[in-house]
Amino acid sequence: MAIAGLVHGHADGFFSHSLGRRDVRIAGIAEPDRALFDRYANKFKLDPSLYHADLEELLRTVRPQAVLVYTSTYDHRRVVELCARYSIPVMMEKPLATTYEDAQAMARAARAAKIQVLVNYETSWYPSNRAAYELLHSGAIGELRKVVVHDGHEGPQEIGVQPEFLGWLTDPKLNGGGALFYFGCYGADLMTYLMDGQRPLTATAVTQRIKPDLYPRVDDEATIVLTYPKAQAILQASWNWPFSRKDMEVYGRTGSVVTVGNSDISVRLPHETQATTRAAAAIQKPYNDPLTYLRAVVLEGAKADALSSLETNLIVTEILDAARRSADSGQTIRLAD
């Protein structure tokens, strides 16, 4: 596989967890900033011959089986359209795009080239989220009524992200917004998953800039309310939490399930007076790890999972785009009839 870009901070975690694996091999890294590549090369002892300044030159000469994307969100469209030209599948860090227009363009390119375009969310690999889905769809808590999702941390500057990462996270063009896009996407993805791909009727969003001295150009606080014929979602995305969090509350007509970290759930079933906490079942391979999953999809024809699929993430981008317009206008945006 090849790497496109190194400006996304998650690239560091990728190298930390992948370099010792035998089932994947890095065939090339495309990054226009040679100093940035050298920093990673020194830290992870990467072969300098992996370096390419230009992605198309890498694709043409190396012909990787897949491309992992660690660019800004804005650059996802360029990467996907380029990879589609060479019929190479892509997995990118969430979210899919900064605009619904870009998301649709990527979908057209992917479908024309018959390539997979997958979106990697940390929460896709949480057994707790899978367990919440299974419990809901088993009928144990009744028909879905309300979902509340909390995502974020103290703020990218406060937690000390890399300077190249902070640079585009706080750029409204390159990130699509601030916390609204970067953390709102998690809840939009999970709600679309829980709803089996149903689009919401409306999106209403409120954003704030609580720390304008740190984030003068983008929001650092966002709440999105989505409505469905018989359900509602409240997505709370923030760079103002006192700690890092990615958790979800799912309320059915007769019971509830709350995710506790990435591996436990707190469940209250009908006629119970209090919730009980239990361990979520482990996720079965190949859907338990992003690289195992990517390899299975590319080489073995495994089905794209709903959380990372292009179809789900088109809806996620439609939601985020509508939420941004709602926050800007102060109006509720209608998505579906």
Please identify what each model-predicted range represents.
Residues 1-45:
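N-terminal Rossmann-like dinucleotide-binding module
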Residues 66-68, 296-337:
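C-terminal helix-rich "cap/oligomerization" subdomain common to oxidoreductases
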